[in-house]
């Protein structure tokens, strides 16, 4: 893939506010395109096919893995997630900066394959705030929440493996800081 500096990786634990920060970034800079990931998980309320995710059956996802059609892929919380390669290449070729919102293992894969990409790890203000955000979604049962919190502790311990660590205290400020990092 040419022009790796146009590839931006945003990662962090579930509930840290990646999606909210990204909405703010996209509203401020029209030259940044958000890559749409594929997943085998069920859509959450309000999520649209092709807008939030490409929702795939597990068989289709595995077929795409076998054909090397993902930039990266990983299994998380019992579901598969991946970044379709074709759309990323197309947008970079057209001159866009491509922003990838992906989980930590996928982010590590991309950083290894594309070392010139910019990787940013988004941190919560603290663990209590992270738990509050996950619970306030109201979309998951207690067992799933506990899994996400356990996974978050592991992921946060890997935050120093990325180019930048940013704590998401304020969405607007975090978005501005990320745009500044992209532009430098």
Swiss-Prot record:
GO cellular component annotations of the record: cytosol
EC number: 2.7.4.8
Chain positions recorded as ATP binding sites: 12-19
SUPFAM superfamilies attached to this UniProt entry: P-loop containing nucleoside triphosphate hydrolases
Alphabetical UniProt keywords: ATP-binding, Cytoplasm, Kinase, Nucleotide-binding, Transferase
Main location, first listed in the record: cytoplasm
Subcellular location: Cytoplasm
UniProt key word Cytoplasm: yes
InterPro entries: GK/Ca_channel_bsu, Guanylate_kin-like_dom, Guanylate_kinase, Guanylate_kinase_CS, P-loop_NTPase
Catalysed reaction, written as an equation: GMP + ATP = GDP + ADP
PROSITE patterns the UniProt entry points to: GUANYLATE_KINASE_1, GUANYLATE_KINASE_2
Molecular function terms from GO: ATP binding; guanylate kinase activity
Broad enzyme group: transferase
Disulfide links within the chain: none
Span of domain Guanylate kinase-like: 5-183
Protein family per UniProt: Belongs to the guanylate kinase family.
Function, as annotated: Essential for recycling GMP and indirectly, cGMP.
Name this protein carries in UniProt: Guanylate kinase
Native organism: Prochlorococcus marinus (strain MIT 9312)
